[in-house]
Amino acid sequence: MQQPGADTWYMPDALQVDALLSSLATEFRLDTAPQYAATVVYADSFDWRLYQQGYLLHCHGQAWTLYHGNSGEVTVQQGGPELSGACFSRDFPPGKLRETLEPLLGIRCLLPLAVVSLSGRQIRLLNRDEKTVARIVVETQQPAGKGPVFRLIRLFGIRGYDQEQALVRRLLEENGVCETVSPLIGFAEGCRAMGRQPLDYSSKFTLELDAGSTARQAMGRIYQTLLENINRNIPGAVEDWDSEFLHDLRVAIRRTRSGLSLVKKVLPDAMVDRFSRDFGLLGKLTGPTRDLDVYLLNRSDYQNRLAPALQAGLNGFFSELERRRQVEQKKMMRVLRAKKSKAILSAWHRALRSPDRQPAPFAGIPVGELSGRIIMKRFRRVLRDGRNLDVATPDTEVHRLRIQCKKLRYAMEFFSSLYPKQEVQILLRQLKKLQDILGDFNDLSVQQEMLRLTLKDLHAGPRRNLEQAAALGGLMQSLFQEQQALRSHFSEAFEQFSDPATTGLFHELFRKQQGAS
């Protein structure tokens, strides 16, 4: 979202509203609306999905307003839920607001980001023909607490009345209204008061490394960035605001573990061994809840795979998954709040900040040389393992290749800032196509095994169990057929990934950098 300000100004402290209106009244007839006052709560997803698309959303009680942040134009006003904590697009009644929010938010919840008190009035400026030529809004914005008070003047032009608007600007300037400001100043300051700022979080790994840094310095920054993501997602995972907090938490843990296994002899061996175990433990303890999340998020897809007569048979299955998830969520909450988990993260932070007593052999080499070695090693491993796959390859071997692709992607993301952005993005897109197929294949394999075990434990007898068995059997067949189809898609994707153009670009980027270091 752009930060507008050309048509918004600070109102000088010495300027009274009545004096300003008197000045405008010398050239226009004024139609002043009643004064408004409200304390609004701005809301967005944790990763700013609305803001990224140019929207701001706030509520006053159950009255919600969505508007374009750049222009200030209202998109839709509608009733909705009371924002006492997290809420989802599905919590809004059917209507335009819900229809707008659903594709933008997806499975992410809305969270309160800033509380701002607004008061002001709107004035229409009319010419001699009683035509509205412009609108002025005089507004006071004050973030919650003892935040500063911002007195603003906003000008909204009307198409076709450029001369009149130029006259308004001149009158404002004559009254000392000169300093432009973003109309979002209250929102921005309100976010800052709550420890946030727009676009301060993204699930994507982004980090600009210094090409002149050592391997130890670069890896320290990478691990610190991942640790920040872990710490930022723990509250949402513990409070269970939405499933993406746990997902992003686990991705940051997994990236940390991959870094420790990928980048050898940069940190001391004892440090690597200790924290590989620690982060492995955190990954294991957060896994069951995430696994259940995946099944529950697929509920609609599972039901749509079945004939209508079989769909009701899944109700008991999902009820049991929801019950198990509640149990696992409570276990995970206790783990993440426990002293041991906090001690692991605190110790990791201290270790990254402290100088190593005995530097590792590769700690001082240039990061560019190290990155080229690691990426090319992983690339060659993916090519080797991928060429061994065929239609009869066991699922476990496909899973192993998926892990190798993931390690290659993590390595490329860690060091991407050291290489030409456009070329790296081309390679990452090719790799992602391959990863998506392998990931879907593995998910289908795991899901079939879970369904098989559920069927095995299902006791014969009640009609409800028979209906569930029929539904699970039909679902397993559907998942199996999709998995088989993916094998041929994999062959196509791997051929493209391993073609001369892609392999040539890998060698050009990463071997050249490696050799130049």
Model-predicted regions and their roles:
Residues 1-517:
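Function-determining surface determinants
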